[in-house]
Amino acid sequence: MDIAKTLQKIAEELGGSFTEYSDNNLILTVPTKDGRFQGITTYILEHDGKKVLEIASRVCDADLPGINYRSLLEMNQELTYSKILIFDGYIQLASEVLAEHVNEVILKDIVDEVGHTADKIEFQLTGKDVH
């Protein structure tokens, strides 16, 4: 499967946009609720000799006052493909999958979950469309 072409098709199907920033950094922007948009970055990496897709979306700064971190951890139980985590100083939604085990349907489900859930949490925590 051509990951870039598949992600471009998914972005178009979701009414969003696609940018191939580099060979291993692909960016989708997808529409969410109430006219907001969410940026999703896919990194194509190699772990232990296997191609891995890391699909992530920033939510907000991890040190934003008033964050209930326990509540965020508990939300992980409700997610199918992604998890809430802190990386590079940001709360993010992220998913990793072996490229050889993913197909277009699953990839679209992952993008949908990451984008919409990140937007939902971002709006709950900040009241804004930040990322």
Regions found by a protein language model. Give the residues of each.
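Well-ordered alpha/beta subsegment
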Residues: Y81-D112, H116-H131
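Short amphipathic alpha-helical segments
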Residues: D2-T6, L64, N68, I106-E113, ...
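Charge-rich, low-complexity N-terminal segments
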Residues: M1-F37, I86
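Short, internal acidic amphipathic alpha-helical interface segments
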Residues: K50-Y90, A94
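Glycine-rich portal/gate segments that line the openings of hydrophobic small-molecule binding cavities
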Residues: L28-E54
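Short, surface-exposed beta-strand-loop junctions and turns on beta-sheet-rich folds
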Residues: D34-G35, D61, A99-H101
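Charged, low-complexity, helix/coiled-coil-prone segments
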Residues: Q8-Y21, D48-G66, K128-D129
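Residues that form generic nucleotide/phosphate-binding pockets
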Residues: T6-E13, S71-M75, Q124
